[in-house]
Amino acid sequence: MAKVESFELDHTKVKAPYVRLITVEEGPKGDKISNFDLRLVQPNENAIPTGGLHTIEHLLASLLRDRLDGVIDCSPFGCRTGFHLITWGEHSTTEVAKALRDSLKAIRDDITWEDVPGTTIESCGNYRDHSLFSAQEWCNDILKKGISDDPFDRHVVED
């Protein structure tokens, strides 16, 4: 089996919440795609419940696109500790961390249920498994710790 970078990462060494650049891939025509680890909670210490994670996922799909050029996808990790963010081009971890921080602030402070996209049977494959309350509580906890642009040393991004 092929080696997967995220399974090679020593999860005992990282200090969440953080943004980590996993890789930049270059296509045959020179286009670049970046893959980021948006780790919201410390691995093997906690996990975001599916309802909250699902709601954060739907909101980040829009909020990150509002704050960062070239977003292709933002998908949750199966371990429920964060997300993969895939973008066109290259962004610094600081730039991504600020966009993530501002998106989580919006979820915590500004979002109402009516703002959450994709919560109907027609628009979501598991529309019953959402919790804005859980999403906002988790965002509050994550923001209290601050988002670091370094996975191994706490370097919290400021305004």
Curated annotation (Swiss-Prot):
Transmembrane parts of this sequence: none
GO terms (BP aspect): quorum sensing
What keywords are assigned to this protein?
Autoinducer synthesis, Iron, Lyase, Metal-binding, Quorum sensing
Cofactor dependency: Fe cation
One annotated GO molecular function: S-ribosylhomocysteine lyase activity
Give its E.C. classification number. Answer: 4.4.1.21
User: Entry's InterPro entries?
Assistant: LuxS_sf, Metalloenz_LuxS/M16, S-ribosylhomocysteinase
Q: How is the cofactor bound?
A: Binds 1 Fe cation per subunit.
According to UniProt, the reaction catalysed is: S-(5-deoxy-D-ribos-5-yl)-L-homocysteine = (S)-4,5-dihydroxypentane-2,3-dione + L-homocysteine
Task: Kindly report, in one word, the top-level EC class recorded for this enzyme.
Answer: lyase
Q: Which residues bind Fe cation?
A: 54, 58, 124
Q: How does it assemble?
A: Homodimer.
Q: Which family does it belong to?
A: Belongs to the LuxS family.
Functionally, this protein is described as follows: Involved in the synthesis of autoinducer 2 (AI-2) which is secreted by bacteria and is used to communicate both the cell density and the metabolic potential of the environment. The regulation of gene expression in response to changes in cell density is called quorum sensing. Catalyzes the transformation of S-ribosylhomocysteine (RHC) to homocysteine (HC) and 4,5-dihydroxy-2,3-pentadione (DPD).
Annotated protein name in UniProt: S-ribosylhomocysteine lyase
